[in-house]
Regions:
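Charged, amphipathic alpha-helical oligomerization/scaffolding segments
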Residues: 35-38, 275, 282, 311, ...
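Glycine-rich beta->alpha junctions and the first turn(s) of the following alpha-helix
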Residues: 221-315
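Glycine-rich flavin
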Residues: 58-66, 71-175, 180
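C-terminal helix-coil-helix/basic helical segment that borders enzyme active sites and/or dimer interfaces
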Residues: 44, 48-52, 317-348, 361-369
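Glycine-rich phosphate/cofactor-binding loops in nucleotide/flavin-utilizing enzymes
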Residues: 3, 366-409
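Glycine-rich phosphate/pyrophosphate-binding beta-alpha loops
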Residues: 177-182, 265-268, 385-388
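Amphipathic, small/basic residue-rich leader segments at the start of a protein or domain
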Residues: 1-107
Length: 409
């Protein structure tokens, strides 16, 4: 795999990702990102406005679709860019430096389409139809995995959303939690179980505008405020039999597919790395321009400020190495290391993003907490990294079980 610049670009967000040898459309990807760089300030300004109001920005979805960003993971032969996880990380990380909510929308969209592109439990006719839609009339898609009662699927357990066989297809009933971007979604990929004597679990594709789909507008978190990650109620929603992935007995985790979960981890890492890069960029500018009257020179000249900024910068360099190694393993299908690398990315990149923004707040002082400035919003958004599944306690416990309970060779 060709190595290039940082997985999320420079701290300033000014370096577009290079073409990669595993992407036949590398030049097209570079043009796409260069186009975004010319309007990134527009995205950043809108993100700040909608963070204050907490209102979803549908124009963001339209602009991403019109520019071609929704086709990034779609196969080349289907009219997409055929991008690898590495390139998708570049795009998500770069976008996160301007608009973390828009980046989160792409995380969910990309992980589903990567799974479709790999035909990971997806029957060919359904996969082909969704790819054609992504190119001819692009719209956002998201996987509805979490539930208010069950919580995250990563903890195990059968979903409470039930699919009942009828003469017209499956009839879905249930409630899903944290459906990011629901006002802007075109398709919902719903994790559900059948009501058969021996239940099967799989993903059911539902149009977001289908009869029986209702949104409960209850998202009120302090971070990712404009993501509209509301709950969704499904009441007697009809799904044609051909609009489901492979249905699995017993092992419900297999129903989501490994590709979807692998991309989810790698892209979330890029997103929260991008949030920290944005926070550091603001802090650097502040320290360079802030000259206290009793000091007579910029705060950036103080050794302890340099130490603090350097600590965050070095951690971001480590993030880059981790994200690149993980994307390489996913590309080559290195199953031995993917699982352990995913645990490291969740705990060290995603979960610790808020630790890094807190360190920056500590040196920025009152200015860092002002709603007029970027840093406090970056910190609130970074806190959301910890709520993504799997949660840190589960990751650490699994790691502990591996080292303590696995017999030595």
């Amino acid at each position: 795999m060709t190595r290039g610049p940082s997985a999320t670009g420079a701290v300033s967000g000014e370096t577009p990702p290079p073409a990669h040898s595993d992407d036949a459309s590398g030049a097209d990807i570079t043009r796409l990102v260069t186009q975004f760089l010319s309007v990134r300030k527009h995205f950043a300004a809108r993100a700040a406005r909608h963070d204050r109001t907490g209102i979803f920005a549908p124009e963001t979805v339209r602009e991403l679709a019109d520019a071609g960003f929704l086709r990034v993971p779609v196969r080349l032969q289907a009219g997409g860019y055929g991008a690898s996880l590495s390139v998708a990380q570049n795009i998500v990380g770069l976008l996160a430096q301007s608009d973390p909510v828009a980046a989160l929308l792409l995380v969910n969209h990309y992980m589903v389409h990567a799974s479709i592109a790999a035909r990971d439990n997806w029957p060919e006719p359904l996969a082909r139809r969704l790819e054609e839609q992504a190119v001819s009339r692009p719209g956002l898609i998201n996987a509805l995995l979490a539930e208010p009662d069950l919580g995250s699927a990563s903890q195990g357990g059968s979903p409470g959303t039930v699919a009942t066989a009828t003469g017209d297809g499956w009839r879905l009933n249930g409630r899903k939690a944290y459906v990011t971007g629901i006002p802007g979604l075109s398709e919902l990929v719903v994790r559900a179980r059948t009501d058969e004597p021996e239940p099967r679990v799989g993903l059911f594709v539902v149009s977001a505008g289908a009869d029986g789909v209702t949104t409960v507008p209850n998202w009120d978190h302090i971070g990712m405020r404009a993501s509209a990650s509301h709950e969704v109620i499904l009441r007697d929603v009809i799904v044609p039999y051909e609009d489901t992935t492979t249905l699995f007995h017993g092992d419900a985790k297999a129903a989501s597919g490994s590709v979807l979960m692998h991309w989810n981890c790698g892209l979330l890492g890029a997103l929260y790395d991008g949030v920290v890069r944005s926070a550091l960029a603001w802090t650097i500018d502040f320290l360079r321009t802030r000259i206290p009257s009793n000091l007579g020179k910029p705060l950036a000249t103080l050794p302890f400020m340099q130490d603090a900024a350097g600590r965050v910068s070095l951690t971001l360099a480590t993030n880059n190495l981790l994200l690149r190694a993980y994307a390489s393993d996913v590309l080559t299908g290195n199953a031995v290391t993917i699982s352990s690398d995913a645990a490291v990315i969740k705990t060290e990149v995603v979960d610790k993003a808020a630790d890094l923004t807190m360190q920056l707040l500590a040196i920025a002082g009152n200015a860092g907490l002002s709603a007029r400035n970027t840093l406090e919003r970056c910190h609130r958004d970074a806190l959301c990294g910890r709520i993504h599944a799997p949660h840190a306690e589960l990751v650490r416990r699994r790691a502990g079980q591996t080292v303590l309970l696995t017999p030595p060779l």
